[in-house]
A protein has these predicted regions:
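Short S/T/G/P-rich N-terminal loop/turn motif that feeds into the first structured element of a domain
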Residues: 1-45, 53-56, 77-87
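A common structural junction motif
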Residues: 25-28, 65-72
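Conserved catalytic core of Hanks-type protein kinase domains
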Residues: 51-52, 64
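Short, electropositive alpha-helical surface patch
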Residues: 58-65
Length: 87
């Protein structure tokens, strides 16, 4: 299953986030494959697209950062999958 993981943070957490990102790379845990990650230029927002069927692994990944950022995680479908829903 594919998920969008969107985040935003308070500006005062910026330096701590950058330090942790440099240290860890922000990589997902086993069971989650990151397809891509994008950072809003000049904003405090970003998102990634990740694939995995383990909700515990997704939750652990978010939990690693939840002291610094807020997350919205939701499953998504592509056009072909949506066509199946609509038929």
């Amino acid at each position: 299953m594919v998920h969008v993981i969107a985040w935003h943070y308070n500006p005062e957490n910026r330096n701590a986030i950058l330090a942790r990102f440099k240290e860890t790379g922000g990589l997902p845990p086993a069971g989650v494959k990151m397809i891509g990650r994008w950072h809003g230029v000049g904003t405090n927002k970003g998102f990634c697209v990740a694939e995995g069927n383990d909700p515990i692994a997704l939750a652990k990944w978010a939990q690693e950062w939840s002291d610094l950022m807020k997350f919205d995680i939701y499953p998504v479908v592509n056009d072909t999958e949506m066509a199946q829903v609509l038929s």
